[in-house]
């Protein structure tokens, strides 16, 4: 028993919140331990607030942590004795992961290889089926009495015995979501379908082009593939931007050796995946197809955009390109930037639960709150590594994050004061006083690779003229956009002004300074992507500046973004700009 307060950093509270003292001697190691099973909620200057949630504990359980590990971490770093209910709550919550196990039905071992068939062509009795195993008599009765589950689950008629439920294979995803809503995550150990063979090998190059797998990349692939044992082959890998998530995806493709669908954020990312595959694997160019608005070519390795999959003529029509997902015998689906997976795509993924699914992301946070859908339909977190750990080992650049709070002039303050709430957001974002700050920062970092990133086109046009820099927006033709990116990589262009198109999957390894002049209402996703643009390993440190209008809603939004960076381990300074 801890008879008196000590210098440990955690204060664990009975409501499952944890206060973390940033000034305590073991703050950093406590933060890393806590990040494996809790979520950061608030990050003021002295005390950070984390929360332990059922989903955070289930992700921890899926990654191999047990309740004893969680409680031991809390006890080790806690300043006071744990509230007496905490060990019980942790144990009870984590025990729910695995209480329900999805397995192949004995009579459907062969049929389970046929997951892509349209269930509408069969009767309910003939459709491939799975067994939901439940060894808890009370939970079994709870499921039996739940009329809402009756449309998908029926008492099993197999020899497996009492306590099991039968379900159609096509309902696999839906049942996982419905039971998670009721507080019971399913451990899915049912068979995964084998796709058509597509063997590829990594090509490590020679001389200046030589490269090798980093230890954490190899660990990530092993954690996903899992020796192809039951319960492996699906899930999410969480790695920082700039740490080589694309290489992890390609290594997973090589390990599985089957036809692969890669879904990513935009056409530029499609092209980048193609270039990486051709540079780092032995795949023949003709084996790679693009499925976008401009080109629709399905090959053994097909790269598509989220936009094309969610396109439909009108809101009452079906999504015509979903048929491509259902029809092809994919052995692996890779969802790049999985935190951006559009809600309509979840519907298709729910029907493809027999296909291996790999999610790649820098953050599990979704702005729409659908983290539970990712957990159910893509899979639990299989591997993650803190940004700061990779930074210390030199795998990504050391970054300095600074929020600069800038006053508004009298005219802008008056306009802001009388504006409606929505208008306040844009007025604060387009504060003209930010221009001198951006110009000063650009001059200070002259000669370095600088990205000025913003939300509003009119504002970006003004900054491009002020800085004498090229502007890239969604309206920039693809060939012009690619030419400017190439010039930046070659060092011929040292400063780019870019809109949100630069947030996702663009490889600009020489960028070392990012100046954010406006953003997406405090999006933590966006902060991860923007910081990631400057985190590629390089000789000099990287700098991330966020320009915020003082005494405005932008300060509130900045708090949301700041929380994400602190969660990842970055020291975050706040400075007030006075001319």
What are the language-model segments listed below?
Residues 271, 287-290, 451, 458-462, ...:
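Conserved helicase ATPase core of P-loop NTP-dependent helicases/translocases
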Residues 230-252:
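Walker A/P-loop
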Residues 1-114, 118-199:
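Extended alpha-helical interface modules used as scaffolds for assembling large macromolecular complexes
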Residues 332, 339-400, 565:
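Post-DEXD/H (motif II) to motif III coupling segment of the RecA-like Helicase ATP-binding lobe
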Residues 268-294:
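Conserved helix-turn-beta segment of the N-terminal RecA-like "Helicase ATP-binding" lobe
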Residues 416-455, 461-462:
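Conserved interdomain hinge at the start of the Helicase C-terminal
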